[in-house]
Amino acid sequence: MLWTRITPAAGGASAPVQVRWRIGDDDRLTRVVAQGTVVARPERDFTVKVDAAGLRPGATYYYTFDAAGEQSPVGRTRTLPARGTSRLRLAVVSCADFEKGYFNAYRNIAARQDLDAVLFLGDYIYEYATTTPGIERVAGRVPAPAHECVTLDDYRMRYASQHLDPDLTALHATHPCIAVWDDHESANDSWRDGALRLEAEQGPWAARKAAARQAFDEWLPLRESPRMYRRFGFGGLADVLMLDGRSYRDQQVLPSDYVALTSPRRSMLGAEQEAWLYGALRSSQRAGTAWRLLGQQVIFAPFVPQVGSALEVDNWEGYPAARTRFFDCVERDRIADVAVLTGDIHSSWGLDLPRSPLSGYDQTTGRGSLAVEIITPAVTSPPFFSRAGARDRAKQFHSASPHMRYMDGERRGYVMLDITRERLLAEWYHVRTVTERTADESKAASLVCERGSARLVEAGL
C-alpha cells in the first residue's frame, strides 16, 4: 500500500488534485513496473493511497508521486513473501507522544536495511491538549491543534502536525508499516461506547469515535475496512494477527466490583472478533505456519494479586474471562508457538504466559506456559517507572512475578524480532535520550523462544 499526502496550494484547499504514481524495482525508477493516476480530494484530507497490484512477492520496490509540478522523495517498500521464506525481521513500536520528545527510535528503525515491516501497536498520536497541566514537554515539540482533539478536523490536524517530523516520515518512506490503534488515537481508556472522563460539550461519543477512525484511515498506509483487525501471512513462516482491543470491548470496571469483573460474558475483543481470532489461530496451525504473532495493545499476562492490584483494569487483567477463553482455545486446539506483541505500558517486558504464574507453572522449565508475551517500550511517552525509586519498584515487580523473564521500566525505544522456523529472537533497543535528536542507542536485552517451548530464555544460554 503506497501512501502520500498532497499539501494544497494557497487558496486551493477545496479543489481536487491529480496525482501520478510510479513504482519500480530500482531507486532511480528507471525500470517502472506499474504506474497510474489518482485524485487527492478534500473529503479525504488530500491523502492518497495506491494498492499497487501485480508485484513480485518478497521483493523490494521504490515509488514516487508527482502532483502540481512537484515530485515526492522516492520511497521504498517491500511485498509480503511467498511461501517457503526462511527468515523474517520486524520492528515493533508504540506510544509516540510528539510533545514528550524526539522520535529517535523511528530514526534508527528508518536507518535499518534489513526489515520486512514495522508493526505499530497503537498510540500513534495522542489526543491531549497541549495545555494539559502537569505534562512535561520537550522544547519545540508542540503539535497542533492546541486543544484536545474531538472533531475530524482536530484529528486530521494532529496527524498532519506529527507527519512534519523528519524521523517519522523517514520511517514511512523506508519500510512498509502494519498498524492498529489503541486509545489515544481517539480518547484515553476508550471502550466500545465511551472513554474515560468525556465532557458533555465534546459531543456524542459515536461521532467522535467515527471522526478518529476516519482520520486514522486517511493518514495511515493501510487497506481500509469496516473492521480494523486483520491477518498478514509471511510466507508460511509467521502469521501476524492484528487485533483491535478498543472498538468492541466492554467498559472497564473497578477492581472492587468483583461480580462485574469476573462475569463470564465479559469481552475485550467482542464476540465477532474473538471468533475470528480463534478461527485464524486454528487455520494457521493447520496450514503448518511456524509462528502466530498477535499484535495488540495492552498487557495480556496474568499477575499475582499483590502486583496485579497496582495495575489498571484497562488491560487483560480486567477481562479475565476473555483471557481464559483464549487460553482454552490454545490448549484445546493445540495451538503452538504463539507470541503476543504488546505496547501501551511504556516499558520493556518479556513474559511467559501461563494461566496462572502461581499454579501449574514452573519458572525454571517453563512448564505450564502456553505462549509468550513481548512488550515494546514507548517511542517517547513517559516510562512506566519514571519517578524516584523506579529501579527498586521494578525489581520488586520483577521478583513478585515468576513468569517475567525481563523488565525495564525506565527507558524508551523499540523491539526487533528476528524469526526463523526454529526460533523467535526478541531484542530490546533503548535510545539514550528523547530530549535531543540523536541516533545513540543500545541493545538492552535479547530473549529467545525456541519453537515448541512456549517460553522465553536469555539468548545464547
What spans do the regions from the language model cover?
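Metal-dependent phosphoester/phosphodiester hydrolase catalytic core
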Residues: 1-461
